[in-house]
Regions:
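Generic hydrophobic, amphipathic alpha-helix propensity
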Residues: 19-28, 44, 65, 69-77, ...
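Hydrophobic alpha-helical connector segments
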Residues: 68, 82-110, 167
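Amphipathic alpha-helical packing segments from all-alpha helical-bundle domains
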Residues: 79, 107, 113, 126-154, ...
Length: 211
């Protein structure tokens, strides 16, 4: 009997996860085609083929689901970066961070809809939530991996969370026009500049002990 109860709870949890995922997917389609302002909760539940009451079991309003979507999509970016990076060895901390930045940039270049959505909505509070809580174990693992990189480098920084935020925000703000409109330069040129700027960010945030 106990086994049946456990199985039933498991099935209910999976059902809830699927409904939440369906709501997120429907919302993403609408937000990226109509915009957040012009999308109503009625639009979302119609797209997801659910009753309006079901929406409120998971989210308070459309801004709550927008925040959940940003957390999810940004988390997926970091998940891919982690999967591609965590087994690789690099000559320096700078080289590692530059390569991780390139992985994130390449994802945004491949999915311009995602670029537009994240560029308009990513904020420090949500970024912090993605890194520390993670939409899934892998996105949180990115921050654990990054923290370990800092620790094993033997270098100290004022705030290593702020360092990665500054780098991601730099990518977010500079890539938008370059990827979508190839202005003021093309992506290869922008990458070259970012490769120069990332070490500068690391140096300015580093605590250098005086001998």
């Amino acid at each position: 009997m106990a086994g049946k109860d456990v199985n039933e709870v498991g099935r209910l949890d999976e059902k809830k996860k699927k409904k939440r995922e369906d709501l997120l997917n429907a919302t993403y389609e609408l937000f990226t085609s109509k915009g957040v302002f012009d999308t109503s909760i009625s639009d979302i539940v119609k797209k997801a083929n659910m009753a309006k009451g079901t929406f409120y079991l998971y989210f308070k309003d459309k801004y709550d689901i927008r925040n959940a979507l940003i957390t999810k999509k940004a988390g997926e970016l970091f998940s891919v970066a982690y999967e591609k990076m965590y087994r690789k060895k690099f000559s320096s901390l700078e080289a590692t961070v530059i390569c991780a930045a390139d992985v994130i940039i390449d994802q945004l270049n491949e999915d311009k809809t995602l670029l537009e959505f994240i560029a308009k909505n990513l904020q420090w509070g949500l970024f912090h939530k993605v890194l520390l809580e993670g939409e899934n174990d892998v996105s949180k693992s990115f921050f654990d991996w990054y923290s370990e990189l800092i620790a094993t480098s033997g270098r100290k920084f004022k705030n290593h969370e702020l360092v990665i935020y500054m780098i991601v925000d730099l990518i977010n703000s500079t890539c938008y026009n370059v990827i979508l409109h190839e202005e003021p330069v093309g992506l290869p040129e922008l990458k070259e500049e970012l490769h120069q700027l990332i070490p500068v960010i690391l140096r300015t945030q580093e605590i250098v002990e005086k001998s």
